[in-house]
Design a protein with these regions (language model features):
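Short helix/strand-capping connector loops at secondary-structure junctions
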Residues: 2-12
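A residue-level marker of the well-folded mature domains of exported/periplasmic proteins
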Residues: 12-427
């Protein structure tokens, strides 16, 4: 219980509390304590909620009984600015979509430059003091500030862009990137002239092994001989240069550009003998579609239908391509036949007739993980901590990571539960 309190409150702050204040703090985090005690503390919501039924008998007998708000003020708190982060700019596009779709009903405002441990708590608090009814914090690093704000303001809906965070006071959201990776893996193998392709992964957090495996399975579907060479951006060295030294020319890089890498070294691309990069395909987030769906749920009174309510589990939205939130951008330079293949796979995933993991799968150590008669559950996919035998590489442990990657691993790493607690447990 104390660990949960320390996640929500700063330890120095708790030391100053009177017994009554400490009891109130425990009461505020109690739902989160209950969630942590459950075998499955996080409930994955894999589909948008069904629209609320109107004109029901209850509506006719007691008009106005529903709790739909007539107006919402929605705040977005970003770790960085749109000018310095493509990730933030993508969420900004999503915010402006809300303004367009719900003109007159929804007002949005953005706060940039929220730094955890510095001004993040203050910016989230400012958003609420400025009248926000709903707050989206768009980085996993802001989950601590989100949780603390939710405990101070239980009537404000607060959502953090992350996965598998066991806090019932907030909701979290992300997308099933592995579906897009399955398609880009097939594209990579189709255009590669050799039987090896490269894959750059960020940090071994929840969902990342599934992305790697889905990419490898998509590639192997096109070329059964293909091997996926895995490099990590969270480890020392230059992954792209390492691939070039191995003669690998088709690479799955970072999912979004960064100021520190050339803009074309993202998504899946091919390097020509002369060093020219050709874009092939890239996962793409339609954040506006996600925000529109969630806000519409609030406006039609259906927010509580997504919440587990009485069982006290945390809610994590984890939507895929069939929701419109996730997609794949195909390059104009992609060969026609390969584009046709990608569109077939996309249509199959959206329709549910193609499941990247509904096939025979062997792990690197030879263990048969799936005999192919069925797929995996969403929880099994999100919590994968193994690599299939088409992958050359490993999942690094915490001690191998560069210092800049360790905070993210502590929050969302696949083996975060094995790590000793930090002295100051402030998120």
């Amino acid at each position: 219980m104390l660990c949960c309190c320390c996640s929500a409150y700063k330890l120095d702050e708790l030391k100053t509390y009177s017994p009554a204040q400490f009891a109130a703090a425990i009461d505020a985090v109690w739902d989160n304590v209950l969630a942590l005690e459950r075998p499955e503390p996080v409930k994955l919501s894999t589909q948008p909620a069904a629209p609320a039924k109107k004109n029901s008998l209850l509506d006719r007998i007691l008009p106005g009984i529903r709790s739909e708000p007539s107006h919402l003020k929605v705040a977005f708190v970003n770790e960085r600015t749109p000018e310095t982060s493509t990730w933030t700019s993508q969420h900004e596009f999503g915010r402006t979509q809300l303004d367009q779709v719900f003109a007159g009903k929804v007002e949005t405002v953005a706060y940039h430059g929220a730094e955890p441990g510095k001004n993040a708590d203050e910016l989230v608090e400012k958003a609420i003091q400025d009248g926000a009814d709903m707050v989206f914090t768009t980085s996993p690093k802001l989950v601590g500030a989100s949780l603390r704000a939710a405990l101070r303001h239980p009537d404000v809906r607060i959502l953090n862009c992350s996965v598998d965070m066991p806090y019932a006071s907030i909701r979290t959201y992300y997308s099933r990137v592995y579906e897009a990776k399955f398609i880009t893996g097939a594209i990579a193998a189709a255009v590669a002239r050799e039987d090896r392709v490269g894959y750059v992964a960020d940090t071994p957090t929840f969902g990342v092994p599934a992305n790697i495996n889905a990419f490898a399975l998509g590639a192997r579907m096109v070329n059964p001989r293909v091997k996926v060479s895995l490099q990590w951006s969270c480890l020392p060295g230059d992954p792209i240069q390492a691939f070039q030294n191995q003669g690998i020319t088709v690479i799955s890089g970072r999912d979004t550009p960064t100021p520190f890498r050339p803009a074309r070294e993202f998504g899946t691309f091919r390097i020509s003998p002369g060093g020219t990069l050709m874009d092939l395909a890239s996962p793409f987030w339609h954040w506006g579609q996600f925000y529109e769906n969630v806000v519409r749920t609030v406006l039609d009174g259906g927010w509580t239908r997504d919440k587990s309510g009485t069982d006290g589990t945390a809610v994590n939205y984890w939507w895929g391509m069939n929701s419109g939130v996730m997609d794949v951008l195909l390059s104009r330079e992609l060969p026609h036949d390969v584009r046709h293949l990608a569109n077939i796979l996309r249509s199959g995933i959206i329709a549910g007739s193609i499941d990247p993991f509904a096939c025979y799968i062997t792990a690197q150590n030879g263990t048969v993980m799936n005999e192919g008669r069925t797929g995996f559950t969403p929880e099994q996919i999100l919590h994968m901590d193994w690599l299939c035998d088409a992958v050359e590489g490993h999942l690094p442990e915490f001690d191998e990571l560069m210092d800049c990657a360790r905070p993210m691993y502590r929050m969302q790493g696949i083996h975060r539960d094995r790590l000793p607690a930090e002295k100051e447990a402030d998120l």
